[in-house]
Amino acid sequence: PSEINDRMSSDQLKRLTPTFDGGFKLDYVRGTNDKPLPYIVNKTMMRIDPPAPIQPGGQFAFKIKWWYNINDRMEIGGRSGFEYFEEDDNYLYTIAQFFPRMAVYNDVEGWQNKQFLGRGEFTLPFGDYEVNITVPSDHLVAATGTLQNANDVLPREKRKKLEEARAEREMPVVIYSEEEARENEKTKSDKTKTWKFAAENVRDFAFASSRKFIWDAMGVEQSDGSVVMAMSMYPKEGNPLWERYSTKAVAHTLKWYSYYTFDYPYPVAWSIHAKSIGMEYPMICFNFGRPEKDGTYSERVKYGMIGVIIHEVGHNYFPMIVNSDERQWTWMDEGLNSFLQYLTEQQWERDYPSRRGPAYKIVDYMKGDKSKITPIMTNSESIYQFGNNAYGKPATALNILRETIMGRELFDYAFKVYANRWKFKHPSPADFFRTMEDASAVDLDWFWRGWYFTT
């Protein structure tokens, strides 16, 4: 009862039920000499005290042993967990935020130690990851990074299929078919396999695992000639929608986001189908969009699925590479990403029914109850009408700036300068405003003041 507050969401109340056991359990925190290190956990933040101050350019190595029980995402919500399929008694795991992650220390605010309250997402430093994932031997695994031991976990014919997919530009190549997935669902292996992944210069790591997965892939050629693998994994429940559109939407997103910003710097981009979620991580995202059980689907479901894939894959650029502070400023990734999502959707299909971007889409919000409207430059946890304010309004503002004030050519040049200047760095709102003005030689103070600092 002491954990119940006067104002709580339904998701927060669900987490108080017996099915949620409270998250991470820490077994120990030790130095490399195996001696315990002092630490304190304050809700979602943890402080570890090293034996001596870390000097500039110095290093501090330590070891943490922890564990937690994977939650039923469909019951208590959240960005990570499992979905259970009663019809065939199988699980689909989408796993994220599963390890203690470093906080950011930067030259503007020092340590970013704001608590995670749900809306304001994550602020993370870049790092290199080597991750071993041991799962039942009949599971397929998708993850941040490049698979290091394909010879150990994939048959030769599947590795050959992946090479064929790398050379394909028009249609995805099926690596594991629906027929294979259906057969795989019927039995459960009592053996395990360890999938090994490595990722460089990423701010996070996530993965998905299931014996239900269908897998398809194709190559996307960059301007420098390098090839990125656009890939999807999804259960049979996602078909026929997912086999028709998912990987094509991934490839389309990489093409057009790279056109407006920079070549995608990572080797793979995954789209994973999971019910009732749209969530992004480096090189991998979890996306909704499920047909009816008979395989039929509406235009709304179709475009919703394509749109969420474009949006979540697009997050690889903002904030996974242009690494803004999501905890503080949701609009810096969601708003910019929603703007590019709109441009990319219009390249997918003329008159694509975009939810955000066109000016008329924001009219009802802007003329609404002024007591329920906050400036875009409002902390992520204090925003009324979160979607309109952090996604729709900045997307509309940038669209107006591009179409009616700066013009497409000048805007696109300045926006690309911002993206390239701040990739693999931690920009603040002022860095975005200054760079757009600096690159275009246009004084936009009046525009930022009106659109971002007032209602």
Language-model-detected regions and their locations in the chain:
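A surface-exposed beta-strand-loop module
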Residues: M8-E86, N90, A181-D190, T194-W195
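An acidic- and aromatic-residue-enriched active-site/binding cleft used to recognize and process polar
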Residues: N42-T44, P53, K65-N71, P136, ...
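Hydrophobic alpha-helical and helix-loop surface patches within well-folded domains
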Residues: P1, F197, A230-T455
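A solvent-exposed, charged loop/short amphipathic helix patch at secondary-structure junctions
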Residues: S2-M8
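Surface-exposed, acidic/Ser/Thr-rich flexible loop segments
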Residues: P1, M46, P53-A143
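Short, charged low-complexity linear motifs
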Residues: F85, Y176-E185, S189, A430-A439
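Hydrophobic helix-coil surface modules that form long, contiguous segments used
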Residues: P100-W111, L117-I310, F339
